[in-house]
Amino acid sequence: LHQTPFTQVCHRLEQMFNVKIVIMNDKFIGKKFTGEFRFGDSLESILEVIRITTPFTYEREEDTIILK
């Protein structure tokens, strides 16, 4: 991923992990992400890597991830 809008990153993660990601914080609007995910990485480990550059908290409720 190179300069990919955060919303597109979330959409890709939704498809990869069969979850719904709800963005509750406007700070994500306009954010871009450059990085690489490896096959076999867990959703939680990917979210932790993203949190390094864009601090946020998240909750998991069954198949829904809420980003705050």
Spell out what each predicted region is.
Residues L1-K68:
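A residue-level detector for the "anchor" residue at the start of short, highly conserved motifs
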